[in-house]
Regions:
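Gly/Ala-rich beta-loop-alpha elbow adjacent to hydrolase catalytic centers
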Residues: 65-73
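Short, surface-exposed "cap/lid" segments of acyl-processing enzymes
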Residues: 1-24
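Post-His helix in hydrolase/transferase enzymes
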Residues: 147-161
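Alpha/beta-hydrolase active-site loop
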Residues: 5, 35-55
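Short alpha-helix in the alpha/beta-hydrolase fold that links the catalytic acid
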Residues: 119-128
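Catalytic histidine neighborhood in serine/cysteine hydrolases
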Residues: 128-145
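Acidic catalytic loop of the alpha/beta-hydrolase fold
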Residues: 113-118, 144-145
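Short beta-strand/loop motif that positions the catalytic acidic residue
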Residues: 103-104, 108-111, 115
């Protein structure tokens, strides 16, 4: 939650007119609980989605995440049914996926070609086998934390923003 990639993703979505919620998964920061290999963290994400929808039921949901959070967003997307799914360097090899039914939603994957934490070939192979409808943006010369390339991540979000979500208006709460 407190890294520059997550902040850039949140700012990019805010610039498009959306409200954003960032949170820690169980066992991270001051959160209670322990790491659960993506299963419990999916429940955490769905609890946040339920809270957001209770506050702003008429606003389209955009679900996103970075690294482990990206993989959890994929796991949560089928139940959450977002209008758009954005995963940045999703750590698909670090969460359980054998029980996963992928969502049929508009989906953007942004991946650094030189990522040494979540290798691009791992993500591309996983996506190609399971999610051919996803739009993949592979950024040359970019590592896991997008050092010196955050502007490219922001541009990807802006350029790929679905027209159906234009002019989001989030009512004041």
């Amino acid at each position: 939650m407190h890294n520059k990639v997550v902040h850039t993703l949140a700012r990019s979505l805010s610039a498009a007119g959306g409200a954003t919620v960032r949170f820690n998964f169980r066992g991270v920061g001051a959160s209670e609980g322990v790491h659960d290999d993506g299963v419990g963290e999916t429940q955490d994400a769905l609890a946040v989605v339920a809270w957001v929808r209770s506050r702003w039921p008429a606003v389209p949901l955009v679900l996103g995440g970075f690294s482990f959070g990206g993989a959890v967003a994929i796991r949560a997307a089928r139940a959450a049914a977002p209008a758009w799914l954005i995963t940045v360097a999703p750590a698909v090899d670090r969460v359980r996926t054998d029980d996963l039914v992928l969502p049929q939603v508009a989906w953007l994957v942004v991946q650094g070609a030189d990522d040494d934490v979540v290798p691009a070939n791992t993500v591309l192979e996983w996506m190609g086998e399971r999610a051919p409808q996803a739009r993949v943006r592979l950024l040359a010369g970019t590592g896991h934390f997008f050092h010196g390339r955050l502007h490219e991540l922001k541009a990807c979000v802006s350029e790929e923003w679905p027209p159906s979500l234009n002019r989001l208006e989030v009512p004041a709460s």
